[in-house]
Amino acid sequence: MANRIEADNLFELTAELVSASAKLHKFLDQKNLPQPSFDAPAPSVALNTANKPYYDARSAIVEAAEQLIRLVRGPRDTLLALSFEHCATASMQVVFKYKFANHIPLHGSTTYSKIAEAVGDGVTTALVERTIQHCASFGLFETIPGGYVTHNATSSLLVTDPDLEAWMYLSAVIAYPAGAAIPKAVEQYGVSSEATEAGYGVSIGRKIAQFQRFREPDGKKDHEMFARAMRGIAAGGAYDFRHAVDGGYPWHLLTEGAGHLVVDVGGGPGHVAMALAEKYPSLRFQVQDLPETVQVGAKNCPEHLRKHVTFVAHDFMTPQPAHEVQDGEGIVYFARFILHDWSDKYATKIVQALATGLRPQDRIILNEVVVPEAGQVGRETERRMHDRDLLMLMNLNGRERTQSAFEAIFASVTPKLRLQRVIHPEQGELSLIEVTLDGVELPAQANGVNGHANGTNGVNGH
């Protein structure tokens, strides 16, 4: 994970920008990859350790450029710029509601009037023109004198990548109003632990949790959009589930001796369990989720994995069912992106449900964001983590947590749990948090694997 740039004057920041740009250019040149261009997608560079120089250079460029802009603008103009950022989301709400992007050809141009005619619904040429011209000012679409508009490499993704488009829709149309409603939610309910009292419910005028709303008959569209959005933000990026599989956790050690049963708690359709089963066929896997979700997972599970991966309906707020295990076989309870959906009140309840039946040979692995202390990572990474924390607050009254916040939960349940280590995948933003019963010592070889772990209670890369 890239370090924070501490330069604080014009020439130092410019030097950082030039140095990082040279490193990125050299890396791409050596790999025979295209250089960054406004007219093409970003270079396709896999998220792995070998490509760390590229991602470090890219992060340094972004941070230096943003710091330069803040420095040159000065405090007053920086505040004024922030005050107008919501206007971009307002324009995108119009773009997504009326699907402007779908009415612009991927090759060639069209006119504002033709877009308005195709949309109908009382949308005027003037509204289309004003909205698209505003979007073009921050890099979405290209406008041509005479009333014409074309796609660029950025806006075309709204047509060619429906999962990414779903994430953008979710952010603009659902999360944006929910965020604006946070003060009203606090005024109405106080600082609440309940998902039914989050900004989302206030924004739609109902006391209802977002997931409950999505499961209502007329919430199906938003539910489907949410599922696509989760795929969109995870595909190949810092939140890709493969960081959990290949990101430094020593899954191979679980195959030793009598082996382990890996229980994927809230595992959705089982994509993580199936990826692990492909790589470690001697392990057994059980995917737990809502009845309708595990039905889909079981149906779509490849035939050759069905003897390794089973699907069981289970409410993760309740204690684990009895598991059939062989003599000496351990159980790993794996929970990815679960606790952040919930306030501490309910996150503690989820962990308590896992702790109740935990044996000395068992462990819990949480795949969650671990928010670093201030100044420990680059500003872009730090901001993205806090952005996600606010998303959890506005939508569900959930939260992203620091290491100390996780440890407070582990200490509050009965029996008490012990944080063994936190492994941070090289290019991922979700850590692997390993927990056992208090007093249990992991084998020495399990600590500090492949340079990813900094030992017990160490947040790696932070």
Swiss-Prot record:
InterPro entries: COMT-like, O_MeTrfase_dom, SAM-dependent_MTases_sf, WH-like_DNA-bd_sf, WH_DNA-bd_sf. The active site is at 340 (proton acceptor). Gene3D superfamilies: Vaccinia Virus protein VP39, Winged helix-like DNA-binding domain superfamily/Winged helix DNA-binding domain. S-adenosyl-L-methionine binds at residue 289. GO terms for biological process: methylation; secondary metabolite biosynthetic process. GO terms for molecular function: O-methyltransferase activity. Pathway: Mycotoxin biosynthesis. It comes from the Eukaryota. Its EC number is 2.1.1.-. Keywords: Methyltransferase, S-adenosyl-L-methionine, Transferase. Pfam families: Methyltransf_2. Belongs to the class I-like SAM-binding methyltransferase superfamily. Cation-independent O-methyltransferase family. COMT subfamily. O-methyltransferase; part of the gene cluster that mediates the biosynthesis of cercosporin, a light-activated, non-host-selective toxin. The perylenequinone chromophore of cercosporin absorbs light energy to attain an electronically-activated triplet state and produces active oxygen species such as the hydroxyl radical, superoxide, hydrogen peroxide or singlet oxygen upon reaction with oxygen molecules. These reactive oxygen species cause damage to various cellular components including lipids, proteins and nucleic acids. This is O-methyltransferase CTB2. The gene is CTB2.
